[in-house]
Amino acid sequence: MDGAHSAGLQLQPLPPTSGATSTSLSSSEGSFSYKENLIGALLAIFGHLVVSIALNLQKYCHIRLAGSKDPRAYFKTKTWWLGLLLLLLGELGVFASYAFAPLSLIVPLSAVSVIASAIIGIIFIKEKWKPKDFVRRYVLSFVGCGLAIVGTYLLVTFAPNSHEKMTGENIARHLVSWPFLLYMLVAIVLFCLLLYFYKERNANSIVVILLLVALLGSMTVVTVKAVSGMLVLSIQGNLQLDYPIFYVMFVCMVATAIYQATFLSEASQIYDSSLIASVGYILSTTAAITAGAIFYLDFLGEEALHICMFALGCLIAFLGVFLITRNRKKAIPFEPYISMDAMPGMQDMHAKGTTVQPDLKASFSYGALESNDSISELYTPATLPVMQEEHSSRSTPGVPYRVLEHTKKE
């Protein structure tokens, strides 16, 4: 009986202990957070790649229409409009990436656009460098691309796994937290000091201007993540648009982005674009990561090794971007003056003693702001010896040409 009764007994599984439950929950949460990080990183990489392609398409269109008389001829080309659509698509991808991954991961991934621009500029735009500059330019550029890729890999691998729902309550709670209020106080004081020295003391250093951009940019990315996260939650069914904090963040996002673009435009009028790209990337990324770590607590609970490896990835990406941008060709400024000896046929005119006459009926007076419609002056010719150019061996020395001497009629 006992054997039959014992045979009929079935072992019941024991309920899981609290330790096992917490372990399984933490592993599932870790897997979910890693998937969200991967989705956000892929969206950001895709967005920056598409933005790079779009900007190079528009650059290619402007290069082809450089000699056009119509200053807005690019509006009539399909290439420029395709670039504009790709630009909007890329920016939308970058905007959506902030809703999935931490801010500290998305911001440094803008190095992808620098890598893509360097490669597309060589292949698509066909930027040509002299063979003697190959070692100085190509090798350093490829080394920079390699370092930027390694840095990007470290950023994605050791990125923080903080994933808090961007609800109106959470954002309002972070906005009035003491760490962020202290950061805002320091940022506002520093911004006012830099703005004073820039506007009143003419401190036009690139570090001063780009620090202004970086401080504004840190607030831009904080508000972008809030707006993007609240929009994604609203699309998923958890409506967040009825919170006033959404509109506060939206207004701050637009305002800081506009002023940031203004300072960048002023910097581009003084400094080379490659220098702005490298210094701006370093300063803006550092300020944005700092703001994200304080506002969204990105690194709260992270291991020290992960934080150090993430910082190492940032430093490697900084070095890669610097190497890529430091050897770009500087734009040659437009030179409105033409050497007379460089014009075809001018040497033959000098040899024959032909006078170079100005066009008196033209509406443009070279070197003066006078109208040539009514001419009542008397011109008497004078002669000067021709100066032989050092670079021209075909010019004939000693042959005079006449320069018109201007005297008023009495």
UniProtKB/Swiss-Prot annotation:
Residues 1-24, 389-410 are annotated as: Disordered. The modification Phosphoserine is found at S376. Disulfide bonds: none annotated. InterPro entries: Mg_trans_NIPA. GO terms for cellular component: membrane. GO terms for molecular function: magnesium ion transmembrane transporter activity. Its main location: membrane. This is NIPA-like protein 3. The lineage of its organism: Eukaryota, Metazoa, Chordata, Craniata, Vertebrata.
